[in-house]
């Protein structure tokens, strides 16, 4: 999902 797209 987009939450993990940044790898934060």
UniProtKB/Swiss-Prot annotation:
Leucine amide modification, residue list: 8
Location within or outside the cell: Secreted
Entry GO terms, CC: extracellular region
Expression by tissue: In larvae, expressed in the CNS and midgut but not in the ring gland, thoracic perisymapthetic organs (tPSO) or abdominal perisymapthetic organs (aPSO) (at protein level). In adults, expressed in brain and thoracic-abdominal ganglion but not in corpora cardiaca and corpora allata (at protein level).
Keywords: Amidation, Neuropeptide, Secreted
GO BP term, pick one: neuropeptide signaling pathway
Role this protein plays: May act as a neurotransmitter or neuromodulator.
Family: Belongs to the allatostatin family.
Designated name of the protein: Allatostatin-A3
Organism of provenance: Delia radicum (Cabbage root fly)
Phylogenetic lineage: Eukaryota, Metazoa, Ecdysozoa, Arthropoda, Hexapoda
């Amino acid at each position: 999902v987009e939450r993990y797209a940044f790898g934060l």
